[in-house]
């Protein structure tokens, strides 16, 4: 019996541990800054004043378009979602069967115990009703800026960017991460682009420390809020 209780307790602890969100850690290699690729040195051509690999476009600007370039993304995220649902189902049914005769005789007989006569009449009635109402609302706002690096340039000119920002405060750390795809045409002349123009964006805002821990329910509360709770 004690062994069974120990197994059940251990299973509960393991299940609750699976409900805990992983704590973000710094220095994730995926979000590490990407350094520009060093061009291979070309053979010097002493017979010409123009050397390959050192040319510059007279009509180009300083907008980021190469691996390792820096882009500042302004965070302008705002989402509002709401949903209402209600349902009501009702059903009434009634059935009655009246027998006046049975095998040629009367279907009603005297009650030997007294009272009303006994009858073979059958009656049934039933009512069923179901009613449900649900409402959900959620809103999020994220503003600010984060500077990231160009991680790759796709063959069609789309720029893949990603990066992170860690801010160490007195009570913990704050983290902002972003990764996505940007069109070169959407980048302003000061190398800024709005987060609303980032395709396939992956934006993370999280933190560690006492403030972040205070917003999380305890392990005992998480059990009652988990799908394992039967009620």
Curated annotation (Swiss-Prot):
Localization (cell): Cell outer membrane; Bacterial flagellum basal body
PROSITE patterns with a match to the protein in the record: PROKAR_LIPOPROTEIN
Signal peptide per UniProt: 1-18
GO biological process, one term: bacterial-type flagellum-dependent cell motility
GO MF: cytoskeletal motor activity
Topology versus the membrane: Lipid-anchor
Lipid sites, type N-palmitoyl cysteine: 19
Major subcellular location class: membrane
InterPro entries registered for this protein in UniProt: Flag_Lring (IPR000527)
One annotated Gene Ontology cellular component of this protein: cell outer membrane
Keyword terms: Bacterial flagellum, Cell outer membrane, Lipoprotein, Membrane, Palmitate, Signal
Residues linked to a lipid group, S-diacylglycerol cysteine type: 19
Organism domain of life: Bacteria
Pfam family, one: FlgH
The protein's assembly and partners: The basal body constitutes a major portion of the flagellar organelle and consists of four rings (L,P,S, and M) mounted on a central rod.
UniProt record similarity statement: Belongs to the FlgH family.
Function: Assembles around the rod to form the L-ring and probably protects the motor/basal body from shearing forces during rotation.
Protein's name in the database: Flagellar L-ring protein
Species of origin: Pseudomonas fluorescens (strain Pf0-1)
Taxonomic lineage from the root: Bacteria, Pseudomonadati, Pseudomonadota, Gammaproteobacteria, Pseudomonadales
């Amino acid at each position: 019996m004690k062994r069974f209780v120990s197994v059940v307790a251990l299973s509960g602890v393991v299940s609750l541990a699976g409900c805990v969100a992983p704590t973000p850690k710094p220095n994730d290699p995926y979000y590490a800054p990407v350094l520009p690729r060093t061009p291979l040195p070309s053979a010097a051509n002493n017979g010409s004043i123009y050397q390959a690999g050192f040319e510059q476009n007279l009509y180009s600007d300083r907008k980021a378009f190469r691996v390792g370039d820096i882009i500042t993304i302004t965070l302008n995220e705002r989402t509002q979602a709401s949903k209402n649902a209600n349902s009501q189902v009702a059903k009434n049914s009634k059935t009655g069967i009246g027998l006046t005769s049975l095998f040629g005789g009367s279907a009603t007989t005297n009650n030997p115990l007294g009272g009303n006569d006994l009858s073979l009449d059958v009656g049934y009635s039933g009512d069923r009703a179901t009613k449900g109402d649900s409402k959900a609302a959620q809103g999020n706002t994220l503003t600010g800026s984060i500077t990231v690096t160009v991680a790759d340039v796709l063959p069609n000119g789309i720029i893949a960017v990603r990066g992170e920002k860690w801010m160490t405060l007195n009570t913990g750390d704050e983290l902002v991460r972003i990764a996505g795809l940007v069109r070169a045409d959407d980048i302003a002349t000061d190398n800024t682009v709005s987060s609303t123009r980032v395709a396939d964006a992956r934006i993370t805002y999280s933190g560690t420390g006492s403030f972040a821990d205070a917003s999380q329910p305890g392990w005992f509360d998480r059990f009652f809020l988990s799908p394992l709770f039967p009620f």
